[in-house]
Amino acid sequence: MNVFRLSGDLSHLAAIIILLLKIWKSRSCAGISGKSQLLFALVFTTRYLDLLTSFISLYNTSMKVIYIGCAYATVYLIYMKFKATYDGNHDTFRVEFLVVPVGGLSVLVNHDFSPLEILWTFSIYLESVAILPQLFMISKTGEAETITTHYLFFLGLYRALYLFNWIWRYSFEGFFDLIAIVAGVVQTILYCDFFYLYVTKVLKGKKLSLPA
């Protein structure tokens, strides 16, 4: 494992922990897109079905279990425990416009036409756009809480670091996964505007708000 993958995994884990702590400590999921969290839960479920068929390492298995567990814990907090605080009026992105095309693309473009491989490919494509409901929600409300922006920053950082991981693996291992790289580039691009606002506003102590 190289430093970029490890840093990416830690950034991803930090994002998940920040979100869970934000919801639990505030006893509220206001400003959080439940639809994005449902998509992430679907991403991890379809990606890590290999937990049932293979073992790579204790680290690999542990991280997969943590991601799946935290994803469903987040969904539970939003839709069950703190349902009264969920802002469904602003969380209105039509997720079928993501899931259906991604499902079709994963059947057409994959590494191997087998159930597990198609589901893995589906998860890669879906993860690249799963944050869109959250970004759409922020665009509708016009602002985001600081802690929510920290969550989004670490989530975007995780994906950016994974791009460097792919570059490192190609340079030193000769490994090249076009599907993962293209999806990662798309996902990173979606965060570009947010990164700019995060650096120019949030890191200077200002609240992230979008221009009217």
From Swiss-Prot:
UniProt cross-references to Pfam families, sorted A to Z: ER_lumen_recept
Coiled-coil region: none
The keyword ATP-binding is assigned to this record: no
Membrane topology: Multi-pass membrane protein
Keyword presence, Protein transport: yes
Compartments, as annotated in UniProt: Endoplasmic reticulum membrane; Golgi apparatus membrane; Cytoplasmic vesicle, COPI-coated vesicle membrane
Name under which the protein is recorded: ER lumen protein-retaining receptor 2
Organism whose genome encodes this protein: Xenopus tropicalis (Western clawed frog)
